[in-house]
Amino acid sequence: MKHFDAVVIGGDVLGCFVARNLRRWNISVLLLEKEEDVCKGITRANSAICYAGYDNKPGSLKAELTVRGNANMASLCEELEVPFSRCGSLLVTYDEDAVSKLKRKLKNGMQNGVPELRLLSGAEAEAMEPMLKKGVAAALYAPSTGTVNPWQLGIAAFENALQNGAEVALSTQVRAIRKTENGYAVETDKAAFAGKMVFNCAGLSADKVQEMAFAPNVRLQLDGAEYLVLDSLAQKPSRILFHQAQSCGKGITAIPCVEGNLLISGIRKPLGIPFATTVEGMQEVQAAARELLPEVDLNQIIRSFGAVRPNPYLENGESIHDFCIENPAPGFYSLIGIKTPGLTCANELGMYLAEKAANYLGAEENTSFDPKRKAISEKDNEIICQCEQITRAEIIEAIRRGATTLDGVKRRVGTGMGWCQGSRCALKIEKLLEEYSHGIL
C-alpha cells in the first residue's frame, strides 16, 4: 500500500486546486479521479462566471472567499496562463417591485467589500448595454465580475499540481474508506492507498463518499439547468447580464465568454437526467433569451448542454447557504455541496484547506513550489480544426499533457468547439491520439 500525507478524492476544479495548494507545503499528495481525465464533473458544465460577491450573507465563509477569490482571479490566471476577462455584470429587472431586491443586494455587497458596486437607473443600464430590451426598471452594476473558462482553469491547476510533485490516479473509483491508526486507508477498484489526511472533493457524490467513513450531517439534492452556446457574434453584450425576476433567484443569464462565444443559461429546475437537455428546456431558454435580448441572433446557436448543481441540506431538510466543509474526524475534510460561486473560490478554498493540513501535519513550506504553469503554445502550419484554427502541434501537446480522448483534447485546446462541432476534424484528431497517447508526461 502506497502512503501519502494527503489523499484528495475528486479531480474537478476544486480537487485540482486543493492538490495544487497542498503542494505549497512539504505534503505528499495523491489525487484520485474516477474518470479518465480531470474536470469532467460539475466543472465541464459551468456558467464560467467569476462572481463579485454581493449575493452572499455578510460574515459567511462564502462571502469572504468570493470577494477574495474575485480580487485574486486576474493574478491567478496570469500565473497559470489562462484567459480571464473582468467584463463586469448587470443584474437587471423590469419589475418595479423587484427593485427592492437589488437594493438589498447592493447593501449586502457593500458589507462584503465588493468594489465599485452601484445601482443604475433603467436608462443608465440601457445606455451601457443597448441590446437589452427597453423598459429596464433598475440594474445593479458590478464591474468586478468576470469570466474564465472553468475546465481550462481546473486543468491548469492540475498540471501545476503535477509539476510541483503531486501524483494522480485516473480511472480510479473509490470503493471504501477505513480509519486506521495513522490516518485512513482508501480502497479503490485498482489499489489501496494510505493517507494521513483525506480531502473529499467528490462533487455530486461527496455525501456518498463521506458515508464510506462517517455518517454525513449534510445531504445533497441536485437540480439542473440547460445552456445554449452561440458562435462568436458581431453583436453581443459586453457584460454578463443577469435577469432579476420578481420571484426568488435569478432568471436567464447571458455570458460573453473569454473565447468570444455567448453563453445563455436557463432557470434552475428539478433535475431530470443529469447533464441532459430537452426540447422543452431549449425552447424555454430561447424564449427567455429573446425576452431579455430581442436582437440576439439565435440562428448562431452551435450547441447546448445541461448542468447539474449540488444543493446541501441538513438532515432535517434545512437548506445550507454557506460553504459546507465537514470535519467529522481529525484529518478528514469533506466539501459537500460546493456550488456557485465554487469556481470563483476554488483556489481560495484550496489555500484554506492547505493551511489546515499544514497545521495538522506540522508541515513546512515547500520553498521549491512554482506557482507558474505554461499554457499550450506550440503551433505549426498544419491546421486540423478549421473552425477554431487549431494546429496539429497544439493537439499533440494537449495529448502529451494527458488528453486521451476527443473530449480531453477539446477541453485543452478548443478543437470541435466551432460551427461543425468536430465533424470535420474528429477523425484526424483520433489518429493523432492513437499515435501520441502515452499517458501524462
Segments from the language model and where they lie:
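N-terminal Rossmann-like FAD-binding beta1-loop-alpha1 element of flavoenzymes
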Residues: 4-31
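Flavin-dependent oxidoreductases
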Residues: 17, 177-182, 187-279, 287, ...
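Short beta-strand to alpha-helix junction loop
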Residues: 58-67, 92-101, 140-159, 276-280, ...
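Helical element adjacent to the flavin cofactor pocket in flavoenzyme catalytic cores
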Residues: 140-197
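Dinucleotide-binding Rossmann-like beta1-alpha1 core, especially the glycine-rich loop
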Residues: 48-128, 251-252
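C-terminal catalytic lobe of FAD-dependent flavoproteins
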Residues: 258, 274-383, 387-394, 398, ...
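Glycine-rich FAD pyrophosphate-binding loop
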Residues: 23-45
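Iron-sulfur (Fe-S) cluster-binding segments and ferredoxin-like electron-carrier domains
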Residues: 275, 391-403, 423-440
